């Protein structure tokens, strides 16, 4: 008769083998005792790259970064108790932003539930509506069918990947002992399961109606964060060219940087939209939005004021319409919609529309005051992955980054827009891509100091803009309150030198944009993890 420890391990071998057969290449393991069978199966699984992360909250955001940059599901493993609960912020972000994660929580067996057993909490359904699916498997039983577990793994991968990528939770109880009593051979290879997805073709009737509404009329294209696809940028530019329409391109759209035609882009809108009533002055009659809703309030306001024809292109089954203005929702890939519209009779609008917006863009560029965003984008190497923190950092990137031929892939956690886990996410991107740069604020850094442990050994440069607390509130109405300093600005007296030293990161303190440039050059040339603090207070 197979002993329980060996049974636990062979069961774990089967399910982890199923995940690897489904194409998963990365696992993030937070050490614990109850999860030992699964951890051992992961560590002994050829083809699975295992990352060890002590803190489960950081581990989950690290996995998020891996999955965000690779576009493939990533395994997370934690022991029982509060350990998996620490995943929740990253799970919410993954759900909101469409990032595939497989969450495997080890658990106590049924007989230890609801009786005061140590390190035992109710784990089934722990993440509520934030998962695409949630399973609690039975305890391993003698004579189990490995094919069942292979298919559970394949099903979980599919649900995490399509039609709307996101987290899937598997809760796995084990009885003691946790270790096999004898050597165990590798399990049988999972049977290949062939899966095909439908090609989301544009609805020609809906497109015909949209084409009639936009042809020969002034309008705008707005591109927010969206998954990158081959030919997508070129298709968007081709549609804008045909319509003589500007593209309001956010940093996360993938349109601001790269060798493609950028002549139709508006990228300094956050400056001039605050000074110009574009809707009343030029009366745009339509907007076509691609991807997530805009980050900045000026662009949000513009989008919300265009009500006659308001279209959203999004292949994922979600509803992105905070302004409640939609007239058309097109479930297809952006490139497919653009190409289908180009096959219809579209009349371009007058050149004066583009010329007026180009003048606004030119004036904003001429008036631009140089700052750390310009220095960073000038110095960052070509073909780099750049993670931008939430709060003030992403808004400054939106306002000041401009556009360039340099190939940059820009990321941010804009699903739920939290400032937690940002360093860990950037470290995950670095682990996946081989190099990353992160731009974050001082409060964001404080929120994820443990993420510096995951930066160890990574080729990552972290720039911390230390403005002494909640600098974003300087730009919000709360600044006029008498309690502003105490309740919102929350001045901090923190420098990050010793934090960097504690985790073995190179460190440089800079006090101006002129100081920042040589510090960046040194860090990029040296490689390895560096933290550069730009002190603005």
From Swiss-Prot:
Known cofactor(s): Mg(2+); Mn(2+); thiamine diphosphate
Pfam families the UniProt entry points to: TPP_enzyme_C, TPP_enzyme_N
Cofactor details (free text): Binds 1 thiamine pyrophosphate per subunit.
Biochemical pathway: Quinol/quinone metabolism; 1,4-dihydroxy-2-naphthoate biosynthesis; 1,4-dihydroxy-2-naphthoate from chorismate: step 2/7; Quinol/quinone metabolism; menaquinone biosynthesis
Catalysis: reaction(s): isochorismate + 2-oxoglutarate + H(+) = 5-enolpyruvoyl-6-hydroxy-2-succinyl-cyclohex-3-ene-1-carboxylate + CO2
Keyword annotations: Magnesium, Manganese, Menaquinone biosynthesis, Metal-binding, Thiamine pyrophosphate, Transferase
EC number of the protein: 2.2.1.9
Entry-linked InterPro entries: DHS-like_NAD/FAD-binding_dom, MenaQ_synth_MenD, THDP-binding, Thiamin_PyroP_enz_TPP-bd_dom, TPP_enzyme_TPP-bd
GO molecular function, one term: magnesium ion binding
Single Gene Ontology BP annotation: menaquinone biosynthetic process
Top-tier EC class: transferase
Complex and partners: Homodimer.
PANTHER family reported for this sequence: 2-SUCCINYL-5-ENOLPYRUVYL-6-HYDROXY-3-CYCLOHEXENE-1-CARBOXYLATE SYNTHASE, PROTEIN PHYLLO, CHLOROPLASTIC
UniProt similarity note: Belongs to the TPP enzyme family. MenD subfamily.
Protein function: Catalyzes the thiamine diphosphate-dependent decarboxylation of 2-oxoglutarate and the subsequent addition of the resulting succinic semialdehyde-thiamine pyrophosphate anion to isochorismate to yield 2-succinyl-5-enolpyruvyl-6-hydroxy-3-cyclohexene-1-carboxylate (SEPHCHC).
Name of protein: 2-succinyl-5-enolpyruvyl-6-hydroxy-3-cyclohexene-1-carboxylate synthase
Organism: Dechloromonas aromatica (strain RCB)
UniProt lineage: Bacteria, Pseudomonadati, Pseudomonadota, Betaproteobacteria, Rhodocyclales
Gene that encodes the chain: menD
């Amino acid at each position: 008769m197979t002993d329980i420890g060996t049974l636990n391990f062979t069961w774990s071998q089967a399910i982890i083998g199923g995940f690897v057969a489904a194409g998963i290449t990365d696992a993030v393991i937070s050490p614990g005792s109850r999860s030992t069978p699964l951890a051992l199966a992961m560590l002994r699984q050829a083809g699975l790259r295992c990352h060890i992360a002590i803190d489960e909250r950081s581990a989950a955001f690290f996995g998020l970064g891996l999955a965000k940059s690779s576009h493939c599901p990533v395994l997370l493993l934690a022991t029982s108790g509060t350990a998996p609960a620490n995943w929740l912020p990253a799970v919410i972000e993954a759900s909101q932003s469409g990032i595939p994660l497989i969450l495997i929580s080890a658990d106590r067996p049924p007989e230890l539930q609801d009786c005061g057993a140590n390190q035992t909490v109710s784990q089934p359904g722990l993440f509520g509506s934030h998962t695409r699916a949630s399973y609690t498997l039975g305890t391993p039983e003698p004579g189990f069918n490995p094919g069942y577990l292979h298919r559970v793994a394949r099903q979980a991968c599919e649900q995490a990947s399509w039609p709307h990528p996101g987290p899937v939770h598997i809760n796995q109880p084990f009885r003691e002992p946790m270790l096999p009593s004898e050597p165990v051979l590798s399990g049988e290879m999972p049977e290949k399961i062939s899966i095909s997805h439908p090609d989301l073709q544009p609805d020609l009737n809906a497109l015909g109606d949209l084409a009639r509404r936009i042809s020969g009329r002034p309008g705008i294209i707005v591109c927010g964060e969206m998954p990158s696809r081959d030919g997508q940028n070129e298709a968007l530019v081709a549609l804008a060219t045909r319509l003589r329409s500007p593209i309001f391109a956010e940093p996360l759209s993938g349109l601001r940087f790269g060798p493609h035609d950028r002549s139709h882009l508006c990228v300094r809108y956050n400056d001039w939209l605050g000074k110009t009533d574009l809707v009343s002055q030029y009366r745009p009659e339509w907007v076509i939005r691609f991807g997530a809703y805009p980050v900045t309030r000026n662009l949000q306001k513009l989008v919300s004021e265009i009500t006659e024809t308001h279209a959203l292109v999004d292949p994922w089954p979600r509803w992105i319409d905070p302004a409640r203005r939609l007239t058309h929702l097109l479930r297809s890939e952006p490139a497919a919609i653009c190409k289908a519209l180009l096959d219809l009779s579209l009349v371009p609008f007058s050149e004066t529309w583009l010329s007026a917006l180009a003048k606004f863009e030119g004036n904003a560029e001429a008036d631009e005051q140089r700052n750390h965003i310009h220095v960073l984008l000038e110095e960052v190497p070509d073909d780099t992955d750049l993670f931008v923190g939430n709060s003030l950092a992403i808004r400054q990137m939106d306002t000041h980054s401009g556009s360039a031929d340099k190939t940059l892939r820009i990321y941010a956690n804009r699903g739920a827009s939290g400032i937690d886990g940002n360093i860990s996410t950037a470290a995950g991107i670095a682990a996946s891509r081989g190099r990353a740069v992160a731009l974050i604020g001082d409060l964001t850094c404080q929120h994820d100091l443990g993420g510096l442990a995951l930066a160890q050994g990574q080729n990552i440069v972290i720039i911390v803009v230390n403005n002494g607390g909640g600098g974003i509130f300087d730009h919000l109405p709360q600044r006029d309150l008498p309690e502003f300093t105490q309740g919102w600005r929350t001045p901090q007296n923190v420098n990050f030198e010793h934090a960097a030293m504690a985790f073995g990161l190179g460190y440089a303190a800079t006090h101006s944009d002129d100081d920042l440039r040589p510090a960046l050059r040194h860090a990029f040339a040296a490689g390895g993890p560096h933290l550069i603090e730009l002190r603005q207070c």
